[in-house]
Amino acid sequence: IRCDRFDAASEAVNCLMPELIAVAAQSAELRNHWYAVEFLSTLSGEMLVTMIYHKRLDDEWMKAAQALQQQLDISVIGRSRGQKIVLKQDYVTETLRVGDRDFHYRQIEGSFTQPNAAVCRKMLEWACARRKAWGGDLLELYCGNGNFTLPLSRYFRQVLATEISKTSVSAAQWNIEANWIGNIKIARLSAEEFTEAYTGKREFTRLKESGIVLTDYAFSTIFVD
């Protein structure tokens, strides 16, 4: 099925799609065995494009992709089986205003992020609007890159957030530091592992290395998105 426009995507993505095809069509290195493309954009105009191939990517492809990257003012990643070539960077930084504050999020290619920034902002505002019933400490399971964690942290004494993806944990740690938030800690545990740790059935070196002592927390709220 031919698709020249995808209305669910941002206007920036829709504008870039035909430009990307037109530029790539001029280069055999870029167009041959080009299988798929993924876009990650931000409200401020950052654009990360992942070009996926059914061939081995070599130096000639890199030269052509660098020229495309410069011409379209985007960041390009090339992927093939067993290959990931990052020409500039493998992330974008999104800024979302929630209430009276801007929150900055590093969103890494290949990891889960909320796909619609405008809807995401509404989700965050909705969650924060329930704060009157909150207090104490927050436990968030599977926090991703800290999407909800950051704004919710303003309404709790301490926040412990769990996540199993190393990539998402890394992004969440960056986001915490970039937003100057001091009451959040991230534990790389599944929900089952957290339960084992919290009930004392099992000890995890990961918690000790992160300086997390579960008895320091008095959880009043559990949050799962």
Swiss-Prot record:
Residues that, per the record, bind S-adenosyl-L-methionine: 114, 142, 147, 163, 225
Highest taxon listed in the record's lineage: Bacteria
GO molecular function, one term: tRNA binding
Keywords: Methyltransferase, S-adenosyl-L-methionine, Transferase, tRNA processing
InterPro entries found in the cross-reference section: SAM-dependent_MTases_sf (IPR029063), TrmA_MeTrfase (IPR011869), U5_MeTrfase_fam (IPR010280)
Transmembrane segments: none
PANTHER family, per the entry: TRNA/TMRNA (URACIL-C(5))-METHYLTRANSFERASE, TRNA_TMRNA (URACIL-C(5))-METHYLTRANSFERASE
Official protein name in the record: tRNA/tmRNA (uracil-C(5))-methyltransferase
Organism per entry: Neisseria gonorrhoeae
